[in-house]
Regions:
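Positively charged n-region of N-terminal signal peptides that target proteins for export
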Residues: 1-5
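Bacterial N-terminal signal peptides
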Residues: 7-17
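PLP-dependent amino-acid enzyme catalytic core
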Residues: 21-391
Length: 391
């Protein structure tokens, strides 16, 4: 039965994909890339841009906007699927898995409540693929528990690992032994996944041209695996967007020196790949003058809610009725609040790129469903992990 469903879903995906090929902004601009880069339309794109009027008024930032990647989830007859920024990457990653590798199983990494791992599980399931999520510990929260239960709902196989070394060793063993398994790195941030945000920059350029927003002076994003930053930065060069990209780092201080290096690495690699496919995609110097790494809101360790993020969650909910979360998106809002408090955003056009899907999917599961999770993950529901408040 699953193979029949897989064939039907894949056929539908191919039909949709072929239609979408001619429509996505990256392929419109560089049609030769279309001939070589697999793509499946998974999300509801383009995502809208709208003003954050109430929050902007409170911050004395009257041109504050939001890019609604919380709404990337594909809409079905029943409800809207989980979204967030990872859907953009998965449109290229899962296409590569299917068309170039004939994959049947998708393997990826994350923390216990990883939004990336969850999105991978959901869209792999939609394409009839198995998903194995190799997860590590993180501070407990309602978001973590919500995501774990959604992982289970979409039939993902969850595996717990105490550290990166053990997990990497297990992944290497799995890939050698499993038939047609395809590995997606943490955050989907490799030269394939990051194409989703090169394309997103052209999507933004189209929205600027049609008057949905003036070219932003500043674009705020949270960054972890650096793919969103690298893709946007490269796409901005090709689309001639001169905005400054404010990347709010979410990892602890000891890892911060790695971020610029990783963004540069991905930028150069993807730029060279695209130029090789279509010579009209120029080779660009790395634009350090457009990139700002904000290190003020990283917190003591991954997933720990800092006071500034808790305040940002409350403000967004009270002023705009939009849910953000404390690990990533709220830290970008916290940076906007901080910069606005110094007057730095007066007379500026500011865009907050919301990477988090804040839709509540708890109607899909029962709280007691956690007992069907592997034992290591049941502990998040039984008080064995320190709770992060105000998520």
């Amino acid at each position: 039965m699953k193979n029949i469903r897989f064939g039907i879903v894949l056929y539908i995906g191919l039909v949709i994909s072929n239609c979408a090929y001619a429509q996505i902004p990256l392929f419109k601009q560089f049609p030769q890339c279309r001939e070589h880069i697999p793509y499946i339309s998974l999300g509801s794109l383009p995502t809208p841009i709208g003003p954050l009027k109430s929050l902007g008024a409170a911050l004395n930032c009257n041109s504050l906007y939001i890019k609604r990647d919380d709404l990337t989830g594909k809409k079905t007859e029943e409800f809207q699927l989980y979204g967030g920024n990872k859907v953009r990457k998965l449109e290229f990653l899962l296409a590569d898995a299917l068309f170039n590798h004939q994959a049947k199983t998708i393997v990826t990494f994350g923390a216990a409540g990883s939004n990336h791992a969850l999105a991978t599980a959901i869209y792999a399931h939609e394409l009839g693929l198995n998903a194995i999520l190799m997860l590590k510990d993180q501070p407990n929260s309602a978001v973590v528990r919500h995501n774990l239960l959604l992982d289970r709902y979409y039939n993902a196989q969850l595996q717990w690992y105490p550290d990166n070394e053990t997990r990497s060793s297990a992944a290497n063993k799995l890939l050698k032994e499993a038939s047609k398994a395809y590995l997606i790195p943490t955050g989907g941030s490799n030269s394939i996944g990051v194409l989703g945000f090169v394309n997103a920059a052209f999507e933004l350029a189209d929205q600027i041209k049609t008057g949905q927003i003036s070219e932003p002076d500043l674009i705020y994003i949270p960054i972890g695996s650096c793919g969103t930053a690298a893709g946007l930065l490269l796409g901005m060069q090709a689309a001639n967007i001169r905005s400054h990209l404010i990347c709010v780092i979410v990892e602890p201080e000891e890892k911060q020196d790695e971020f610029l290096k990783q963004i540069k690495k991905l930028f150069v690699e993807i730029n060279e790949n695209l130029h090789a496919l279509d010579a009209s995609f120029h080779l660009y110097d790395f634009p350090e003058d457009q990139l700002v790494l904000n290190k003020k809101f990283c917190g003591p360790s991954y997933g720990v809610l800092i006071p500034e993020a808790a305040d940002a969650i409350t403000r967004m909910q009270q002023t705009e009725q939009i849910r953000v979360e404390g690990t990533y998106s709220a830290k970008a809002i916290a940076a906007i609040i901080d910069d606005a408090s110094s007057g730095a955003l007066e007379e500026k056009t500011v865009l907050f790129w919301n990477t988090y899907c804040g839709i509540d999917f708890s109607h899909l599961f029962e709280e007691n469903d956690y007992k069907q999770l592997p034992a290591e993950f049941q502990s998040y529901f039984e008080g064995a992990h320190t709770e992060v408040k105000n998520y």
